[in-house]
């Protein structure tokens, strides 16, 4: 077993857990905040747009069962990579799409994948998802963890626009 981590920001972190959580080779997925300048921020602080943080998920995966490249491909299908200031109904810099990389290898994979997506002409607008070096990841409050299991009806409401976009662009 070779456990590695991936950090993806793609709008509301509630909507980013389930697509990864059920995959073979995923050990754990946690919602949290990263990319900012405030240590141990709270949800309320992040909502003020003054911390620099974005909502994200940190994924612990067994790279012998699922590759980082596969995770990046799954990530693209969960987001609108042409929207730099939020995702779907969630607006603002705390919902911006970012792939946070932990190594030069992850950066190379993410950049190659972004270039391939741009060249695919799947989207009419340019791909604006950022690729940034990973910064400290602060786990969100417990009530945010595994939200799709705790409140499936609310999760379904949050996911509606995302799922329609996915059906339109990826199927």
UniProtKB/Swiss-Prot annotation:
One Pfam family cited in the UniProt record for this chain: PMSR
Enzyme type, top EC level: oxidoreductase
A Gene Ontology biological process term: protein modification process
Keywords assigned by UniProt, alphabetized: Oxidoreductase
Domain of life of the native organism: Bacteria
SUPFAM superfamilies associated with the record: Peptide methionine sulfoxide reductase (SSF55068)
GO molecular function term, any single one: L-methionine:thioredoxin-disulfide S-oxidoreductase activity
InterPro entries recorded: Met_Sox_Rdtase_MsrA_dom, Met_Sox_Rdtase_MsrA_sf
Signal peptide: none
Enzyme Commission number(s) from the entry: 1.8.4.11
Catalytic activity as recorded in UniProt: L-methionyl-[protein] + [thioredoxin]-disulfide + H2O = L-methionyl-(S)-S-oxide-[protein] + [thioredoxin]-dithiol; [thioredoxin]-disulfide + L-methionine + H2O = L-methionine (S)-S-oxide + [thioredoxin]-dithiol
Keyword presence, Oxidoreductase: yes
Active site, per annotation: 12
PANTHER family cross-referenced by the UniProt entry: PEPTIDE METHIONINE SULFOXIDE REDUCTASE, PEPTIDE METHIONINE SULFOXIDE REDUCTASE MSRA 2
Family under the similarity heading: Belongs to the MsrA Met sulfoxide reductase family.
Protein purpose: Has an important function as a repair enzyme for proteins that have been inactivated by oxidation. Catalyzes the reversible oxidation-reduction of methionine sulfoxide in proteins to methionine.
Protein name: Peptide methionine sulfoxide reductase MsrA
Organism lineage: Bacteria, Bacillati, Bacillota, Bacilli, Lactobacillales
């Amino acid at each position: 077993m070779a456990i590695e981590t991936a950090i993806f920001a793609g709008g509301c972190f509630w909507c980013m857990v389930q697509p990864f959580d059920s995959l073979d080779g995923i050990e754990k997925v946690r919602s949290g905040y990263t990319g900012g300048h405030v240590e141990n921020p709270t949800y309320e602080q992040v909502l003020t747009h003054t911390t620099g943080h974005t909502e994200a998920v940190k994924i612990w995966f067994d790279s012998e069962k699922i590759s980082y490249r596969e995770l990046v491909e799954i990530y693209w299908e969960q987001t609108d990579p042409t929207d730099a200031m939020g995702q779907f109904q969630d607006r603002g810099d705390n919902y911006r799409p970012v792939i946070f990389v932990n190594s030069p290898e992850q950066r190379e994979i993410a950049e190659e994948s972004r270039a391939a997506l741009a060249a695919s002409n799947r989207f009419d607008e340019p791909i604006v998802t950022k690729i940034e070096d990973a910064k400290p990841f602060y786990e969100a409050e417990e009530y945010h963890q595994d939200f799709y299991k705790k409140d499936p009806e609310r999760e379904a409401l949050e996911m509606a626009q995302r799922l329609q976009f996915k059906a339109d662009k990826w199927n």
